[in-house]
Amino acid sequence: MLEQMGIAAKAASYKLALLSSGEKNRVLEKIADELEAQMESILSANVQDVEQARANGLSEAMLDRLALTPARLKAIADDVRQVCNLADPVGQVIDGGLLDSGLRLERRRVPLGVVGVIYEARPNVTVDVASLCLKTGNAVILRGGKETYRTNAATVRVIQKALKACGLPEAAVQAIDNPDRSLVNEMLRMDKYIDMLIPRGGAGLHKLCREQSTIPVITGGIGVCHIFVDSSADIAPALKIIVNAKTQRPSTCNTVETLLVHQDIAERFLPALSKQMAESGVTLHGDETVMQVLHGPAKLVPLKPEELDNEFLSLDLNVVVVENMDGAIAHIREHGTQHSDAILTCDMHNAARFVNEVDSAAVYVNASTRFTDGGQFGLGAEVAVSTQKLHARGPMGLEALTTYKWIGFGDGTIRA
């Protein structure tokens, strides 16, 4: 089954690569319209997925990721329309010039070909990835988690209907709708057809892909994100940032999971933090110093060492008091996932040092980690957030779905 999907996707990719920006945008507009027109069928499938997931004991954080509402689906359709408004990188001449040999050389952006994406309970990923791949002239094979296979299947049927209406092969966007996990292993070996693989899920999935895939893999999306409250931090705006970073949508990978507090501000800052977190319903996981300083009103439990590597994806927050900037940076290097980390400070020397020494895809000064997102960065919907350094890093927008080719123009030009 998968080989036939691969053959069809590769054939579709050749046709997609030749489309003009206008043709691709018309397809995306049609997809957005169909998502709204077929909303009832998608939501009906999603209700079944959510009910099954709840019966299987899926956590509330995961259920939130899985659930669609009319408003969320409308927002997804609007995101597709936003992709239409983005500049098409395909065909862009990155650099080049006339060589001494007389050869005129260009380095031009081109589609990757076929992209494979493996993801878990995030039905919005289906549309986000499909729209970005189509905008960049790539075909895509999607493998969502078993928790979302009804939703994904319904969504892909809608996308394929739009493709067909625009005279394009339905195989441009395909989904593996069989939840059998063995198909993941088969997909990882489809290097003959898939040019790049993007896993979006937990550490186990990323490890499997790194170890078993014969396809180039871009990993990311695991966010043990940190905020360091420096000794010079202004407490009121710092609390506002922390509330946003923790509570706006706790199930996302750019949510803060560990708060590092400079010891010189701890006694003034921690009580204010506790009050704010109590109002926000956040449970604090405190180290020894925190446990000694705080006695309410927020719910407080002793921090377990293994929790420092946790992506809670819930209203839980580690709080650790560190001696100084060195301690904060060392902690992030040991426990961070190179996703998103922030410093809250009024000392711009410390801010500059933090930015230079924390090796993460996104580093913030006096801002929430929640900004690490393709839409917030002006990239449109994102394929993933890469925490590695090759071939992309941070939110992966359109350019991350392209490669380049060298094109030489001559006039009977030969090498001397």
Swiss-Prot record:
Source species, domain of life: Bacteria
One Pfam family from the record: Aldedh
CDD domains for this protein: ALDH_F18-19_ProA-GPR
Biological or metabolic pathway of the protein: Amino-acid biosynthesis; L-proline biosynthesis; L-glutamate 5-semialdehyde from L-glutamate: step 2/2
Enzyme class: oxidoreductase
GO BP annotations listed: L-proline biosynthetic process
InterPro entries according to UniProt: Ald_DH/histidinol_DH (IPR016161), Ald_DH_C (IPR016163), Ald_DH_N (IPR016162), Aldehyde_DH_dom (IPR015590), G-glutamylP_reductase_CS (IPR020593), Glu-5-SA_DH (IPR012134), GPR_dom (IPR000965)
Disulfide bonds: none
The keyword Amino-acid biosynthesis belongs to this UniProt entry's keyword annotation: yes
HAMAP family in alphabetical order: ProA
Name of this protein: Gamma-glutamyl phosphate reductase
Gene field: proA
